[in-house]
Amino acid sequence: MITAADFYHVMTAMVPLYVAMILAYGSVKWWRIFTPDQCSGINRFVALFAVPLLSFHFISTNNPYTMNLRFIAADTLQKLMVLAMLTAWSHLSRRGSLEWTITLFSLSTLPNTLVMGIPLLKGMYGEFSGSLMVQIVVLQCIIWYTLMLFMFEYRGARMLITEQFPDTAANIASIVVDPDVVSLDGRRDAIETETEVKEDGRIHVTVRRSNASRSDIYSRRSMGFSSTTPRPSNLTNAEIYSLQSSRNPTPRGSSFNHTDFYSMVGRSSNFGAADAFGVRTGATPRPSNYEDDASKPKYPLPASNAAPMAGHYPAPNPAVSSAPKGAKKAATNGQAKGEDLHMFVWSSSASPVSDVFGGGAPDYNDAAAVKSPRKMDGAKDREDYVERDDFSFGNRGVMDRDAEAGDEKAAAAAGADPSKAMAAPTAMPPTSVMTRLILIMVWRKLIRNPNTYSSLIGLIWSLVCFRWNFEMPAIVLKSISILSDAGLGMAMFSLGLFMALQPHIIACGNKVATYAMAVRFLAGPAVMAAASFAVGLRGTLLHVAIVQAALPQGIVPFVFAKEYSVHPSILSTAVIFGMLIALPITLVYYILLGL
């Protein structure tokens, strides 16, 4: 039976965390103490130092030789059961997909164990439950987050192969990825593919970042590599940040001019910018053979309302899309007056600026759209249809039928048999090629993540020191403690800043939020209870396992979802709204299990 003293211990452990979160929220939302840039700096400190050192502190001080293997088996079995059910659903059901498998797996099995679980369970069940939570943290950081990265990169690789090599994927013998490419997801970084056919007829692919996404192109003019006369540019730092990091899959306005654009690409050319756009200046007009080619789309449009497709510049200049006639005329007139070209740039990854000030629908009445040739941009035909209030899993089937109808029209226009075109599935490269590609990308992600090092080093140190009774030097111990002690409060403070920067607490609509909360707080604990019974957990261990499964959503899965653009609004709502309702829900579980 739960006593008043037990309830007070729980509140003593949890209220300070919520105080830190509310202070951060008020500092941005009510008192305007921190700007978004300052919040970004605080969040970066938390991500690079506070949380990794907090994780290292908990793991290094936990004795791995006293781990409860049955409790770990229950947690592992729960995740494997959920993963097996979701995998079967994605393959057998028309409504299933890899994206939903990843999202539902995150919602149901990956709670916020480090920040919320350890203090909450210690307050409920004592010190031994804190040790159990540390064991869960170790498995999450080393195994389950790595598995999620594997699934995300597999999705990115599949999208890359499907879009770039729809008919020749089976003939790919190797895929080499440049060192500066850290993700295969075209929404995050604009990437290009180059192919080479060897004598045996096999295709060898090289994946690299496109010229438009390379960070060094923005500094070429200051380094003296510009091919044009230096002149003041109105491309601001904010726009550079927004070009590289906005997640909105819609064209966004940018105010830099065409001369800046060519200087960034760094290509010397024997024709002027006016020739490229067919602008005739001077007393004697002369014809331009570029305008005719640029005005023709390279591929036929599948539907009347489809976005314009890209033509080609002489390589390596980016391609210019054929905009509607009004847009083309406006751009030409503006250029004749010496005005700057107003460009639209497809943006592809996550940005707090774009989250708060999200752009609207594309408007081609004022400018031409500019894209890089062969750039991976999955956003153009993979709009996040799940982030709406009227969402249902059935929408996927409707959208699939719409897409098939568009493909059928395109195939009919090209004189092909649409039924045959849709019947043949896209082949994939050999398993060895895909496995090597994904492992390389996951490895690059892991070595850039400070939590990977903190977890592994903490585990190795605990194995050594508890085996031979070593003690960490006092200088090192206190250096780590002074930061790790602040880690818990700073993590909650950072979460409060994140909540304050969002335009809506429920970003995905009420219906989707209800589904997400049901998966997080009902389905997850239910599967954990079944797995715990299966491995023989009883008594207090069973209670700890169920309450641990009912913790709010983990932050790392949301970071991955935002980075790879896989239902980020759902995970954002699960983190924010879940944190607000987690305390009463876990208290209900605690009281019911204690009856």
UniProtKB/Swiss-Prot annotation:
Belongs to the auxin efflux carrier (TC 2.A.69.1) family. Keywords: Auxin signaling pathway, Membrane, Transmembrane, Transmembrane helix, Transport. The keyword Coiled coil does not apply. Acts as a component of the auxin efflux carrier. Seems to be involved in the polar auxin transport which may promote adventitious root emergence and control tillering. Disulfide bonds: none annotated. Residues 1-6, 60-70, 122-131, 477-479, 538-540 are extracellular. This is Auxin efflux carrier component 1a. Homodimer. Residues 28-38, 92-100, 153-455, 501-516, 562-574 are cytoplasmic. It holds the Pfam family Mem_trans. GO terms for molecular function: auxin efflux transmembrane transporter activity; identical protein binding; protein homodimerization activity. Expressed in vascular tissues of root, stem and leaf. Expressed in anthers, embryo and in the primordia of adventitious and lateral roots. Expressed in roots, stem bases, stems, leaves and young panicles. Plants silencing PIN1A exhibit inhibition of the emergence and development of adventitious roots, increased number of tillers and enlarged tiller angles. Its main location: membrane. The gene is PIN1A. The chain crosses the membrane at residues 7-27, 39-59, 71-91, 101-121, 132-152, 456-476, 480-500, 517-537, 541-561, 575-595. (indol-3-yl)acetate binds at V51, N112, L114, Y145, I555, V556. Residues 281-335, 404-427 are annotated as: Disordered. GO terms for cellular component: auxin efflux carrier complex; cell periphery; endoplasmic reticulum; plasma membrane. It is a multi-pass membrane protein. Signal peptide: none annotated. Residues 411-427 have a biased composition (Low complexity). InterPro entries: Auxin_eff_plant, Auxin_Efflux_Carrier, Mem_transp_PIN-like. GO terms for biological process: adventitious root development; auxin export across the plasma membrane; auxin polar transport; auxin-activated signaling pathway.
